[in-house]
Structure formats: C-alpha cells, structure tokens
Amino acid sequence: MARITVEDCLEVVNNRFELVMMASKRARQLANGVQATLDNSETEDKPTVLALREIAARKIDNALIDEVEKAERERAEREALEWAAAEVVADEDMSKNDD
C-alpha cells in the first residue's frame, strides 16, 4: 500500500482546512456504506485513509461529496415518509379491528 501524506492531498486541495473538511465528510460517507471510487479490496483501508487516497487520486471533489450528501438526505427523508405511512396504515388497521 502506498502511503498517503497530507502533502499529496494538498496538491489537489490547496487549503489544509478545506482538506480536513473534505476528508472528514468523505470518511463519514464511506463509513456509512457509500461506494468508494477506488478499489479497497486489497488494502482494506479505514474510511479516513481511503478518503485521503481518493482525494490524492483526484477521484472526488466537493461537488461529489455534496451530491452524495444530498442523495443520502433524500433517501433518509423518503425512508421516514415510508415509515410514517406504514404507521398510519397500521393504526387504521388496528382501529378497524376494534370495531
């Protein structure tokens, strides 16, 4: 496994603070099951290292991170609506059985 350094990533992202924000957001996404843009089967890197590898390889940028965050938010909202609808149906079924 090639070692990833902050300097490698700073060639892609000029600001250290922006790099930290990008890497932390992406690592959180990877830890939550989002598909990586690099093959991780051989190295099995932890999400933080994998996020830095993706940044250094220019596989991700803020636009991709924001797109994934938006998709995850929409998925969570859709799931919450489905649960709420299922509860309403269950409540209606229970009230029909009480009659």
From Swiss-Prot:
Catalytic activity: RNA(n) + a ribonucleoside 5'-triphosphate = RNA(n+1) + diphosphate
EC code(s) of this entry: 2.7.7.6
Keywords per UniProt: DNA-directed RNA polymerase, Nucleotidyltransferase, Transcription, Transferase
One annotated GO biological process: DNA-templated transcription
Pfam family, one: RNA_pol_Rpb6
InterPro entries: DNA-dir_RNA_pol_omega (IPR003716), Pol_omega/Rpo6/RPB6 (IPR006110), RPB6/omega-like_sf (IPR036161)
GO molecular function, one term: DNA-directed RNA polymerase activity
One term under GO cellular component: DNA-directed RNA polymerase complex
HAMAP family assigned to the protein according to its UniProt record, in alphabetical order: RNApol_bact_RpoZ
Function: Promotes RNA polymerase assembly. Latches the N- and C-terminal regions of the beta' subunit thereby facilitating its interaction with the beta and alpha subunits.
Family in the record: Belongs to the RNA polymerase subunit omega family.
Family annotation (PANTHER family): DNA-DIRECTED RNA POLYMERASE SUBUNIT OMEGA
Oligomer status and interactors: The RNAP catalytic core consists of 2 alpha, 1 beta, 1 beta' and 1 omega subunit. When a sigma factor is associated with the core the holoenzyme is formed, which can initiate transcription.
Protein name stated in the entry: DNA-directed RNA polymerase subunit omega
Organism: Stenotrophomonas maltophilia (strain K279a)
